[in-house]
Each structure stands twice: as C-alpha cells, then as structure tokens.
Amino acid sequence: MKTQQHNKNANSKREVIYFAGGCLWGVQEFIKHLSGVFATEAGRANGLTDTTKGTYDGYAECVEVSFDPSAVNVNELIGYFFEIIDPYSLNKQGEDVGKKYRTGIYSKQSSHLKTAIGFIKHRDDADKIVVEILPLLNYVKSDEEHQERLTRFPNDYCHIPKKILHKYKSS
C-alpha cells in the first residue's frame, strides 16, 4: 500500500528516491508528512532476492519516496532525512542493530546520488558520516504488516522521538 500525500496536479513531474534510516516504520511515518511527497512505501533496498520470504539477503530496510521535485528537491529531502538519523552510527539506529538497519540513500538516477554525495561533502562532519550512497539495484516492497505501521499502530516502537517524528505533520 503506497500512501498518497501530495495533492499536486496530476501532470506534476514525479521522481523516486529511497532512504534507509534504521527501522523503516519511523522513516516512513516521518517522510510521508513532508511537503512535496506524493507517496511512500516501506521496502527493502539492494538485497539479493525479489521476495520478503527466506533468510536475510543483505538488504537495507528503506522507504521508497515518490516526490515532486518542483515542490521539494533531493537536497532538501536529504536534509530532512538527516533530522531523523544518526549519520555516524554504522548498522545501528536507536535500539535496532544489524546490517539491515544501516543508513543509506539509493536511487536509479545518478543525479540523486551526486546530490547526496555533495550534501555530505559540504558538511563539516563529512569524514565521520557512514551513510552509504549507492545506485538502487534491487527493491522489494515490504509485507503489508509493515506498510504505514505507525499510522495504524502509533504506540509501536520507534527509534525516532515523537516530537521529531511528527514535526512536519499537518493538523
């Protein structure tokens, strides 16, 4: 289930980028409220299989973000993303530990990856940041139980503090 948020003209240009920031429940809940975001979907980036069944295959929990680049650009989306992650933590966000909880920015568009590299390069702490930036080679939608999890079950665990989680949510 993709969540539709942005009510722009149907002719608006759409682009897609993928963010991995630990447990995908919180990442989806935060990003879906950003202005310019059309839709979000919980998924898995860059694993080796095309299924959610079976053993761990190297994927990163991620959120597919469909957005209107005339309303919010990639650099701005990355800035928002950095509000909810610890960019220095390798394979760990909050209490979630393991390679699937690594931080990453993925895309099929090289311009998105170049923007992400530039975003980090221009930070004073660039040498400490462990966010991976890679082409999206494989994406698998997460099972329905993970879609919109914190919307449906707002008291479930989330590594992102509530005051930040809903910072951009309209009343």
Which residues make up each language-model segment?
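Flexible coil/turn and secondary-structure edge motifs
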Residues: 1-171
